[in-house]
Amino acid sequence: MNYSALLDAISQGPLARWASILPEQIAEGLSEERYGDLPAWKTVLAQLPAITSSHTELAERVSIGAPGDCDETTREQLQSVLEALIPWRKGPYWIHGIHLDTEWRSDWKWDRVLPHLASLKDRLILDVGCGNGYHCWRMLGAGAKRVIGIDPSPRFVVQFHMIKQLAGLHYPVDVLPVGIEDLPEKLHAFDTVFSMGVFYHRRAPMDHLLELKNALRPGGQLVLETLVINGKEGDVLVPEGRYAMMNNVWFLPSCATLLSWLRKMGFKAPRVVDICPTTTEEQRSTHWMRFHSLPEFLHPENPALTAEGHPAPIRAVFVAEV
C-alpha cells in the first residue's frame, strides 16, 4: 500500500499543507498494533494474482479485465483472495469474469447523484467516508483529475488497494486511512467534496458541515447525501436507541431542516436534488456480504418502519456551493 505517487503529486499546490503531515497520519491509520487484523489482510493483499487487464471501464460501471485475461485456476485464486476480505459493502465490481455483488447497489446511488453535479472533469475531489472507494472510481470515470477518498476503516482501505492493484496503480485515485477531522483546518483546496452516508453518524452535525466547507475552495461544490425524515423545518429525529439496528445514528433532519442548517453554515444556494426511500433491492445480503442487511433491519410486520419503530430509511441528496 504505497502512497508515494500521491504524496509527490500533492507536495506542491493547495494540498501541500496536508502532504507534509500525511505520512504520519497514514502510518497511524494503518498501525498493526492498533488494528490486529491488519497483518492478515496485508498477507491476503500480497496473494493477489498478477493479471494483465485487457481493459478497465469506469464511466458506466467499474469493470476490470475480461474472463479471457486469465485461466480458470488463476480466477479461482482471485476469487479466494477477494472472499478473504468479506464483507464487501460498496460496489458492484466486475473483475475478470467475477461479479462482486456487494451489499449496496452503490451504482444506483451514483446514477441518482451524477446528473445534478457540476462537471467533474479535471476536478480535484474529496470523498469523505468513501468505504472501499467504489464512488471514487466512478468520479474518476466522470473525468476527475484526481480523487482522494478518506475512510478510517483499514479493511476498506485494503479492499481499495486490491481493486487498484487489479485496475492499475497509475490511476490518480487513492483511499487514505484517515477521517475528515485529520485534514488541516481551512484547507480550501478541493473543487468538489462528497459526504455520502456519513452525516447521520456524526455526533456534531454542524461541525461536520463546517469541516466539509473548510475543505472546499471558494466556488467549490458540496454533495451531501444522508438519511432524512418527512417533516417541516425544525423537525429532527434523534433516536434514543438504535436506528435500523445501528447504534451510531444521531441526527435525521427533515429536508427543510437540513437546508436551513446548510444556510446557517454559510453554504450558497443549498438545494435538494433527490429523495429516495432505500429498498431491499438496493441494500441486501449477498454472497459477498453474508450478514444481516436492510431486510432484517425493518419491522417484520410493517416495512415502512425500522425494527425499532422509526420511519424506514429515506435518503436525500443535497447540493450547495461555497
From Swiss-Prot:
Its EC number is 2.5.1.-. The keyword Translocase does not apply. Keywords: Transferase, tRNA processing. Coiled coil: none annotated. Catalyzes carboxymethyl transfer from carboxy-S-adenosyl-L-methionine (Cx-SAM) to 5-hydroxyuridine (ho5U) to form 5-carboxymethoxyuridine (cmo5U) at position 34 in tRNAs. Signal peptide: none annotated. Homotetramer. NCBIfam families: PRK15068.1 (NF011650), tRNA 5-methoxyuridine(34)/uridine 5-oxyacetic acid(34) synthase CmoB (TIGR00452). One of its GO terms (molecular function) is transferase activity, transferring alkyl or aryl (other than methyl) groups. Pfam families: Methyltransf_9 (PF08003). Transmembrane segments: none annotated. Carboxy-S-adenosyl-L-methionine binds at K90, W104, K109, G129, D151, P152, S153, I180, E181, M196, Y200, R315. Belongs to the class I-like SAM-binding methyltransferase superfamily. CmoB family. The keyword tRNA processing applies. This is tRNA U34 carboxymethyltransferase. GO terms for biological process: tRNA wobble uridine modification. SUPFAM superfamilies: S-adenosyl-L-methionine-dependent methyltransferases (SSF53335). It catalyses: carboxy-S-adenosyl-L-methionine + 5-hydroxyuridine(34) in tRNA = 5-carboxymethoxyuridine(34) in tRNA + S-adenosyl-L-homocysteine + H(+).
